[in-house]
A protein has these predicted regions:
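N-terminal [4Fe-4S]-dependent radical SAM core
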Residues: 1-11, 58-62
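C-terminal scaffold of the Radical SAM
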Residues: 6-8, 29-54, 64-346
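Local cysteine-cluster metal-coordination motifs and their immediate loop/turn environment
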Residues: 16-29
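Short amphipathic alpha-helical interaction segments
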Residues: 344-359
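A short, conserved structural fragment
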Residues: 358-368
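Minor-groove-contacting beta-hairpin "wing" of winged helix-turn-helix DNA-binding domains
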Residues: 369-373
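Short, amphipathic alpha-helical interaction segments positioned at domain boundaries
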Residues: 375-389
Length: 389
């Protein structure tokens, strides 16, 4: 049995609302004109107190809160009063580490740009801007509400307000060629003083408008060879600008990796409040197995269940094998891989599936670690699916 020391503790806050639904998005996001601010504030508060009781109940070993991440949806649309209240209550319940990272996702619309300075005053110290593209034609294809000028202004304002700025970009779009993508990426890196960049290949997810178009033959996915070339060139260009890949789609300058996401991938403790959010933690009184707590996904259902008291949809205690698979699936996303010492049953890597992957040179097991071979990173999802199933 692993004698776990105190793990980090992170908080994820989900705000499910957006101005519009993007055609590629399969996240738990919805369009609504107005919300009951008091009910939402009360529900978030109830969940924070309920999580504290669960951490005590499962004897979860953790230090003070190390990160908070406001995601969505579009959390920069969250009323500032709710944002301020969540930060205030969570600091009282869990206490903040001195170097706590507090991140918030934002879109480059004019309304949200005006809130950057106010958010910074409330305690947000890291901003992640959903730029997605600096090409107006691509932005229109992606169903985004902003244009290139909006994005440029938002990034400039963010870098003048926050010391830690990340942007998201989507590449390998339908009919996009590699030269255009390289020029766009080079432009971003040469023009803006950002510390972190998330670069995602466009995927056609079930339940999205793009998926419907794909089924109708109106949209095509790029072939695997071209996708691999996009991926390789992206890594090369970012490395040339001193951005190191630390996770499959995430690149950062030294010391600017997302602490919050690293807590996920390193299988630390985290709690999640809001519709569809979930938490995972190590329980000392459950033989150090992983405990998962899930919230109701539908915003109306979640609000009804939490505005008076707090109610989670499901609490699941992983068995030993599930705990180890969860640790592996999260950790194998990291460029450094995962330490075998973190596994409850270290003999799991002797099982047939792992031996097959190692023989095919898809994974590397050495120096007490397991990692995906860099030459096969593009196959990560297939490798993880194989391990899960």
């Amino acid at each position: 049995m692993i004698n776990r020391k105190k793990n980090f503790l992170s908080l994820y806050v989900h705000w499910p609302y957006c101005e519009s639904k993007c055609p590629y998005c399969d996240f738990n996001s919805h369009v609504i004109e107005d919300v009951d601010k008091d009910a939402w504030t009360k529900s978030y508060t109830n969940q924070l107190y309920e999580y504290k009781s669960f951490l005590d109940r499962f004897d979860v070993k953790y230090d003070n809160l190390s990160t908070i991440f406001f995601g969505g949806g579009t959390p920069s649309l969250m009323p500032l009063k709710i944002l301020d209240h969540i930060l205030d209550i969570s600091s009282k319940i869990f206490k903040f580490k001195d170097d706590i990272e507090i991140s918030l996702e934002a879109n480059p619309s004019s309304y949200e740009r005006e809130k950057f300075r106010q958010m910074h005053k409330l305690g947000i110290n890291r901003i992640s801007i959903g730029v997605q593209s600096l090409n107006d034609k691509n932005l229109q294809f992606l169903g985004r509400k902003h244009n290139y000028r909006d994005a440029e202004t938002a990034i400039d304002l963010a870098t003048n307000t926050f010391n830690n700025v990340s942007i998201d970009l989507i590449y390998a779009l339908y009919e996009q060629n590699i030269d255009d993508w390289e020029n766009e990426l080079q432009s971003v890196l040469n023009k803006f003083n950002i510390n972190h960049l998330s670069a995602y290949q466009l995927t056609i997810e079930r339940g999205t408008r793009f998926f419907k178009d794909f089924k109708k033959g109106l949209l095509k996915a790029i072939d695997n060879d071209l996708a691999a070339e996009f991926f390789t060139r992206t890594k090369t260009i970012l490395n040339e600008h001193n951005f190191q890949r630390y996770e499959i789609s995430n690149f950062a300058k030294e010391k600017f990796e997302s602490k919050h996401n690293l807590n996920y991938w390193n299988s630390e403790n985290w709690i999640g409040i809001g519709p569809g959010a979930y938490g995972r933690m190590w329980s000392s009184n459950q033989d150090n197995k992983r405990v998962e707590i899930k919230n109701y996904k539908n915003p109306k259902t979640w609000l009804n269940k939490n505005s008076q008291n707090s109610e989670f949809e499901n609490i699941n205690i992983f068995n030993q094998y599930e705990s180890d698979i969860d640790t592996l699936i999260m950790g194998l996303r990291l460029s450094k891989g995962i330490e075998i010492e973190k596994l409850i049953d270290k003999s799991i890597i002797q099982k047939k599936k792992f031996k097959e992957l190692e023989e095919e040179n898809l994974i590397i097991i050495e120096n007490g670690k397991i990692k995906i071979n860099d030459d096969h990173l593009i196959k990560l999802n297939s490798i993880l699916s194989y391990l899960i199933n």
